Amino acid sequence: MGRVAFYICGLLTGLALAFAIPKGKAHDADTLANNAPQKNPLFINMTSGDSWRGWMGLHFAHATLKQGHPVAIFLNLDAVKLAAKSGEQEKKPSMSRVPREVLADFIKDGGTVLMCGPCMTEFGLKLDDLIPGVQMGRPGYTQGFIFAENARTLTW
């Protein structure tokens, strides 16, 4: 009888705690709307030079920037090709524009685009080959975006 009473007491205590503690509000619309987006930066590490995958990531980054969040995109591996002024970028039917156009508007609207120097060299790109406003990433500078207070990191 003692074990059953102990079990029931534990169960009732658990239920009481479950209903006594307020629900988390990390993802409800009111909490997100009332947070200061400018204090919640996003760092996106982009690794794919594929036009459609790149467009999706850049479109997401630009939408996040438009919500007021500071956004920095680090283009590395073959994603550096997304910032090239010339060269083919396939435009699929679901894409409203090619990646370089999204990047240009993203920069114009205040977003930061960082490039991997060794990756550019690997693909034969120079700074003059890139759309205006792209910055070279470098040790210490790039990490400033990654480890900024409240920053979130996303790899695309």
Where are these regions (language model features)?
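Short, glycine-rich nucleotide/cofactor-binding loops
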Residues: 37, 42-55, 83-88
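Short internal beta-strands
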Residues: 61, 71-77, 114-117
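Single-pass membrane-anchoring alpha-helices
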Residues: 2-28
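A glycine-rich helix N-cap at a beta->alpha junction
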Residues: 91-117
